[in-house]
Amino acid sequence: MTSRFRLPAGRTYNVRASELARDRQHTEVVCNILLLDNTVQAFKVNKHDQGQVLLDVVFKHLDLTEQDYFGLQLADDSTDNPRWLDPNKPIRKQLKRGSPYSLNFRVKFFVSDPNKLQEEYTRYQYFLQIKQDILTGRLPCPSNTAALLASFAVQSELGDYDQSENLSGYLSDYSFIPNQPQDFEKEIAKLHQQHIGLSPAEAEFNYLNTARTLELYGVEFHYARDQSNNEIMIGVMSGGILIYKNRVRMNTFPWLKIVKISFKCKQFFIQLRKELHESRETLLGFNMVNYRACKNLWKACVEHHTFFRLDRPLPPQKNFFAHYFTLGSKFRYCGRTEVQSVQYGKEKANKDRVFARSPSKPLARKLMDWEVVSRNSISDDRLETQSLPSRSPPGTPNHRNSTFTQEGTRLRPSSVGHLVDHMVHTSPSEVFVNQRSPSSTQANSIVLESSPSQETPGDGKPPALPPKQSKKNSWNQIHYSHSQQDLESHINETFDIPSSPEKPTPNGGIPHDNLVLIRMKPDENGRFGFNVKGGYDQKMPVIVSRVAPGTPADLCVPRLNEGDQVVLINGRDIAEHTHDQVVLFIKASCERHSGELMLLVRPNAVYDVVEEKLENEPDFQYIPEKAPLDSVHQDDHSLRESMIQLAEGLITGTVLTQFDQLYRKKPGMTMSCAKLPQNISKNRYRDISPYDATRVILKGNEDYINANYINMEIPSSSIINQYIACQGPLPHTCTDFWQMTWEQGSSMVVMLTTQVERGRVKCHQYWPEPTGSSSYGCYQVTCHSEEGNTAYIFRKMTLFNQEKNESRPLTQIQYIAWPDHGVPDDSSDFLDFVCHVRNKRAGKEEPVVVHCSAGIGRTGVLITMETAMCLIECNQPVYPLDIVRTMRDQRAMMIQTPSQYRFVCEAILKVYEEGFVKPLTTSTNK
């Protein structure tokens, strides 16, 4: 049937045109918004309105104060090419298909620190977002961290663990990760029991504090292909632009390095600053799948740079001719920046707001397989970190970090004289204190173990909302290609990266008058339970570097937090005092009449320091070759670039900043066995214990020894260097040491300490004198010879098992040139020592036993150094921070101090530059 028909008078009537005219008069459209609690809410708006109108009605519905962190993502776009609703563009021009339209309410900008979010309700929205991203596979997460995050989520939703109510299988109706295995629930339940006393708000804060350490936290990915037609991913984040290829981060371009980002048609360009040795600036080009994908990536870069790096958005450019014609995109980010958002939240946030949390219905959501979606672009277990500075927080996320709920006394400088009027009391708690080295410069010994404080949970849980319907977005694979043409003259969409104006504080920084008074009394051993670093002599502010759980510093209200800057100690200004003087001031508090320590701190000032150092962060280059290179040349290029990055990082100091931010203990790893009553005496230091998952287990009834397996895999080779990192034997653990050596088949022991340093016993002599023999249980050790020089000693021994009547030759290599305090001034002797170790263990597959006193500091330095040498030989890039992270995933606190880390970084650079170890054409074993 046609739309035209002839009337008797010979006239026509166009039915379709009439219907279109009718539709044009109906301007109201329906937008279905999928919220973060998996509910769908319909909103009616005028299709001619700007996108901001729809955003405003959604924010009003949610009663959301801190709005600038969130946005609406178009649901018809795939997640690998995200497109956000533009607040300054008419809705009808963005939503092309017929009403109703579907959009997803999501977090758009992920803050680096949850303390920047002022309202508990805002943090709850973040919590829902990240929980959803992990469940759907959008945010890959290692299993141990996933279990810890899930336990915080359970604590938030179910409250305290109750053995009578939380029976076996009480988590069977919940899903937290894709393809969740059955034993995963048991691990969650075990961790859930450790969170007794945490309120929902505290559990969610700890959830966010842990989630921000994930590799892909806050990264928005867009897919592309390189010159070999291999898939790469271009990620946009707060710090700059990332390039991933074959699961490996190939490079990072910080905003400081980028001059301009631009696009034309489907070609996206990054223009980099000119290096000193370069004659002109570098222009990188990438071919996207189409114009829309290219512009989406460009807009994401503009928004992230403006939000995180500028104090305020750039004003629109005024041009007389702009009314008549335009060239390029008129898009500019016009919302609040992070600086403005934090300040706005402080002024407008309702911190006493009460709201109802939605119960999880995770099984209603159809899970997505990340591996299938990304076509092996990323793996949650095998993602390799190469060039991006770590975003991990200082230390392990603390289970009782509640600065967001306990508002401290806010003081201005004019009120400092009245500090004595503000009294805060702490609750007593039983604590255990670690041993402290006389060479330590810490204010107090680290206190790690304590009996849990008994806190009364909240009076009641907020009412639960009805079960929600869930929804899943489709993920479509998009293909891109890579271009390196220099098309400077053909670009029609540009965004110049402005130089940051002088500003009093970096983005999100805390104003100088935002001070908090903290009071605490020492425990029965005279310890406060926190460490500080910095001082006038170190040209750094005094920063709290660690707060141990269950200690006075942890239990006081307001709580002392890692990253707080100490301004006054007992009313004394410490701005011009050295580190040692600051330590003495803190110790002297125990001798005061009141015995009380009074600190005036600037909360979380460490983030000011970190962001200020971003101005001097190392530059990274990613310069595609004109023709595909063979793998050997590619590896050599990556190795050279990693050494350039390391050298610049040592000059600017960013390597130490990144090291300070790395977790000391891997989140989720337990050390329960070391704390059993029968094993406590076997630990040389109370705060240095082996992980349960990687500890060496002895045969027999008493199976404990303070030792961990550490395996270091060398990529692109068959090499896996196996170590056993352990503490120096005590008089009553020598038998355990030799039993471990025998059972593990080890034929080499590397010792990195002398027996006594500065009057303190660091290691008991667990071997006999030359030509002598000693028995240790059923093991007899004979020392045949001892020779060496001023730096190291070689001992040839025989280990004899009297029960089995079997013997084994054994070599002990002891390094004796490490100074009593600090690190060696020159690494030459140490590098010679490492080379001897490598030569002695060549061809051996059994683990090498390595120990110093605690088994973490110098032991970590040696393992890092040998691993770096192997990587150089195999033409692989060397990233020391990744090596330390890998070690700490297997034994806590490996490489103990920043000075040790700097020493090994300088030694690695020396090995490369002076040719101690040279790349081989083929990967061979040592």
Curated annotation (Swiss-Prot):
Main location: membrane
Domain Tyrosine-protein phosphatase residues, every copy: 655-911
UniProt cross-references to InterPro entries, sorted A to Z: Band_41_domain, FA, FERM/acyl-CoA-bd_prot_sf, FERM_2, FERM_central, FERM_CS, FERM_domain, FERM_N
UniProt-annotated stretches for the region Disordered: 380-412, 430-475
Keyword Hydrolase: yes
Catalytic activity: O-phospho-L-tyrosyl-[protein] + H2O = L-tyrosyl-[protein] + phosphate
Regions of compositional bias (Polar residues) in chain numbering: 398-408, 430-456
Compartments (UniProt record): Cell membrane; Cytoplasm, Cytoskeleton; Cytoplasm
Annotated keywords: Cell membrane, Cytoplasm, Cytoskeleton, Hydrolase, Membrane, Phosphoprotein, Protein phosphatase
Function in brief: Phosphatase that plays a role in immunity, learning, synaptic plasticity or cell homeostasis. Regulates neuronal cell homeostasis by protecting neurons against apoptosis. Negatively regulates TLR4-induced interferon beta production by dephosphorylating adapter TICAM2 and inhibiting subsequent TRAM-TRIF interaction. Also dephosphorylates the immunoreceptor tyrosine-based activation motifs/ITAMs of the TCR zeta subunit and thereby negatively regulates TCR-mediated signaling pathway. May act at junctions between the membrane and the cytoskeleton.
Subunit and interaction comment: Interacts with MAPK12 (via C-terminus); this interaction abolishes PTPN4 catalytic autoinhibition and thus activates the phosphatase activity.
Protein name per the record: Tyrosine-protein phosphatase non-receptor type 4
